[in-house]
Amino acid sequence: EMFSNDDDRLRFTQFLLTRCYLVVVSTPSQESAFRIFTVMNSRGLDLLPTDIIKSTVIGSLPKEKQQGYTEKWEGLEELTGRDGFNEVFTHTRTIFVKERQKKTLREEFEEYVLKTVSPEQLIDDYLVPYTNAYVQLKNCEFTATHHADEVNGLLFWLNKTNNSDWMPPAIKFLAEHPNDSEYVLWFIRKLERLASYLLVTAQDVN
């Protein structure tokens, strides 16, 4: 809300100076700080693992690159929504680690992803193509001159399964072969059959 005049701005400033308190909480580790914030944050947006990862990644960039990459990061987040962007990071972790998550997303992302790629590589080579692939897969919006309807029909059923285990391999494949619609159709068809079989037979692949 915008202030209409100087008196309103003055009253607001006086309120901040006399009625608001700044509380500083010190913790021994980033993990404990995250837990404390989650418990104490009764208002406002929840702090997601991606928020912490963002501060680490953007903070590691040279000063002259931070603004540009911040805008690129926020553009991707706007494309998916905060929760959707968090899912992209979960699937990216799975692509790198190739096994079930054993610790927190933030811990494993820092250990297995951030230590193997530079901040620029993470955003340009992984987050950008993986986010674009995620949006197409999640929304059944694969576009191509051939086979788009067939692919999107299969994606509709994949999204109906009771898990998202199919998403990481689909993201990686689509990100690496965005312009080969025939190959994408072949892969998604095989993936849908596998996912359906595992669902119907209640196979445990953990």
What kind of region is each of these model predictions?
Residues 1-206:
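Flexible coil/loop and intrinsically disordered segments
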